Amino acid sequence: MSAVRPLRPERQAQKQARGAAARLSGRRAEVLAALWLMAKGYRILGFRLATPLGEIDLLAQRRGVLAVVEVKSRTSLEAALEAVTYEQRSRLRRAGAHIAANRAGLRDAVVRLDLIALAPGRRPRHLLNAWPNTGNDGQ
């Protein structure tokens, strides 16, 4: 095995700048998605919500539904759907169930995994129940 060489300072700075730009872009996408959901009558319960099972981009509620919303900024809806792996879907499903079970007022809510796909120059696409729990979760 060879040792991993550290990045040159200029490469490290470029990598950090790309990471910062990606985080800012992600936050902007989440704010836009939250505004879209609020316009559709959802109440936003949390942004980048940390749970023992992982982070949820947006947690929203409307009527008896608790929507665990994954936000993806991609060129197409298909690319956004493909960007969320089986492991991520499983983690999101468990995190949503954990929140519903541990928060008063949400115990009877139906937990649903939604996707909001954002693409440059297009309206946000809100895909309800993007990954139905079919037992094999699309595998």
Swiss-Prot record:
Top-level taxon of the source organism: Bacteria
Organism name: Caulobacter sp. (strain K31)
Family statement drawn from the similarity comment of this UniProt entry: Belongs to the UPF0102 family.
Protein known as: UPF0102 protein Caul_0175
GO MF annotation terms: nucleic acid binding
Pfam families: UPF0102
Gene3D superfamilies the UniProt entry points to: 3.40.1350.10
Source species taxonomy: Bacteria, Pseudomonadati, Pseudomonadota, Alphaproteobacteria, Caulobacterales
